[in-house]
Design a protein with these regions (language model features):
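A solvent-exposed interaction/effector surface
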Residues: 2-205
Length: 205
């Protein structure tokens, strides 16, 4: 199933479901989210670093800059803009996370200023979604890395997690950072080569 089809299916559901779960090492309670496997193609992209505390406004400005550069270089755009987390939420503290805006393209792209050209690896990904915007990403990370991946005996393949923003509503009197958005997340995953502890299971079988 294509990534966009999976996202649309998630958007049509009540995305967050089930009783909250306590995840070891996480503060408070974390909800349960829909998640499933999808396959992404390897490709190239224009990328631009984002501030760690970026907003929707800053994200839009970065997307616009990448789109303008793609038009100047006559590069076909192959997907909607995305942003990526360069890090492992299960291992790296939030103050070490780095984000960048990503515009998938084809053709002979050239770097310009702080915009670079990168290879975006494909392969199997776990696709999930939160309808609660940027502020709920940490909760989604905790669910995926603390519960979903261990339950499937999977682990992060590489520390590069893609995200796509979907507008849910935008009223004329609302600011850009108050727009209701859903965030789709794509985690590159692989079967674990060593036993992965599952919350709630005893270490002794």
């Amino acid at each position: 199933m294509a990534a966009d089809e999976i996202t649309q299916k998630h958007l049509q559901r009540q995305r967050v479901r089930g009783a909250p779960s306590t995840i070891p090492g996480a503060g408070g309670m974390v909800g349960s989210y829909d998640a499933e496997e999808t396959w992404r193609q390897t490709g190239r992209a224009l990328v631009l670093p984002l501030e760690r505390s970026f907003t929707l406004q800053g994200l839009r400005e970065s997307y616009a800059r990448l789109t303008e550069l793609a038009e100047q270089q006559k590069l076909p755009v192959t997907e909607e803009p995305m942003f990526a987390l360069k890090g492992d939420p299960n291992e790296d503290p939030p103050h070490k996370w780095e984000y960048e805006a990503v515009l998938p393209i084809r053709g002979g792209a050239k770097p310009e200023g702080d915009v670079t050209v990168a290879r975006i690896q494909g392969g199997m990904h776990i696709a999930s979604l939160t309808p609660r915007g940027l502020g709920d990403l940490k909760g989604l990370y905790v669910y995926l890395f603390g519960k979903f991946l261990p339950s499937k005996k999977q682990q992060l393949m590489r520390p590069y997690i893609l995200h796509r923003v979907h507008l849910l509503s935008e009223g004329p009197e609302r600011g850009l950072d108050d727009v209701a958005v859903a965030i789709a997340v794509y985690v590159p995953a692989v079967l674990s080569i060593k036993p992965v502890p599952v919350p709630g299971e005893s270490a002794e079988a």
